[in-house]
Amino acid sequence: MAHKKGAGSTKNGRDSKPKMLGVKRFAGEKVHSGTIIVRQRGTRIHPGENVGLGRDYTIFATCEGVVKFEPTTNDRRKVSVVAD
């Protein structure tokens, strides 16, 4: 039996690419219709006025305006777009 391991492949070396989640437009920033405001997994931040919720829970603006974050009940946050 060989007392040295052959030149086999390592068991490491795999990783998934970053998902680039998080807030993309902060409070007070002007946005256009269709601008992504938050990318998230699940509804960590809930949609408010003038925003839409994508099927991957991405929140995006549905009209032109200014981003506004506000707290709601039970330690939840809501994001809205205040139209100009």
From Swiss-Prot:
PROSITE patterns: RIBOSOMAL_L27 (PS00831). Residues 1-25 are annotated as: Disordered. GO terms for cellular component: ribonucleoprotein complex; ribosome. GO terms for molecular function: structural constituent of ribosome. GO terms for biological process: translation. Keywords: Ribonucleoprotein, Ribosomal protein. PANTHER family: LARGE RIBOSOMAL SUBUNIT PROTEIN BL27M, RIBOSOMAL PROTEIN L27. Belongs to the bacterial ribosomal protein bL27 family. This is Large ribosomal subunit protein bL27. It comes from Dehalococcoides mccartyi (strain ATCC BAA-2266 / KCTC 15142 / 195). The gene is rpmA.
